[in-house]
A protein has these predicted regions:
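Short, solvent-exposed secondary-structure boundary motifs
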Residues: 1, 65-73, 136-152
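Bacterial N-terminal signal peptides that target proteins for export
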Residues: 2-13
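Hydrophobic alpha-helical membrane-embedded or membrane-associated segments
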Residues: 14-18
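C-terminal motif of bacterial Sec signal peptides marking the signal peptidase cleavage site
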Residues: 20-23
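Bacterial signal peptide processing site
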Residues: 25-27
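Extracytoplasmic low-complexity, Pro/Thr/Ser/Ala/Gly-rich segments
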Residues: 30-94
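Mature extracytoplasmic domains of secretory-pathway proteins
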Residues: 72-136
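Extracellularly exposed regions in secreted/surface proteins, prominently low-complexity, repeat-rich
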Residues: 140-176
Length: 176
């Protein structure tokens, strides 16, 4: 009887240890909200709150490539988060903005760059890294982005991580 008890006890300990390890590793996969819980995502002067529910409306803001109205994301992009550009707003009186973090395939990103910027998406890998001293990235932590590349067009800054896969579309606005 004592031997069965010891075997059962060891099984319980192993199961609990595995459960703890699983819980710890899964916690790393859970994404952190783009804005702190309880913080308003509405910026003064901004046309929409900075959240996933208003993504379609946010993408209609400003001028996109070739002067057309609104913005777009790479084909098939998955939006990870939508956050307010609070640092830009603090530095620019009356300014507001949105930071849209997304993931997309390498091919979709290259096609997007060719279609929406003055650059050929084939050659992104050979371009110099984005300047961390630039005031265009105050709402994104460049230190967490490997080999960043950027392009600006109209009211937007496109920031990409190389190798390609992650990107940020930074839309800015201000009273005119």
């Amino acid at each position: 009887m004592c031997r069965r008890f010891l075997v059962a006890w060891r099984v319980v300990v192993v199961v609990l240890a595995c459960a703890c390890l699983t819980a710890c590793s899964l916690s790393r996969l859970v994404s952190v909200p783009a804005t702190p819980v309880g913080t308003s995502t509405v910026q003064e002067g901004a046309p929409y709150p900075a959240d996933m529910e208003h993504l379609d409306q946010i993408l209609t803001v400003g001028r996109g490539p070739n002067g057309r109205k609104g913005q777009e994301l790479p084909e098939g992009a998955q939006v990870v988060s939508v956050a307010p550009a609070l640092n830009f707003a603090a530095d620019f009186p009356g300014g507001w903005g949105y930071v849209i973090a997304f993931t997309a395939t390498e091919e979709a990103i290259r096609d997007y760059v060719t279609r929406n910027t003055g650059f050929n998406g084939k050659y992104i890998d050979n371009s110099p890294a984005a300047n961390p001293e630039s005031n265009r990235f105050e709402d994104v932590d460049l230190s967490a982005i490997q080999n960043p590349w950027s392009a600006g067009f109209w009211d937007v800054v496109l920031l990409l991580e190389r190798p390609l896969g992650r990107g940020w579309l930074i839309i800015r606005g201000a009273p005119r």
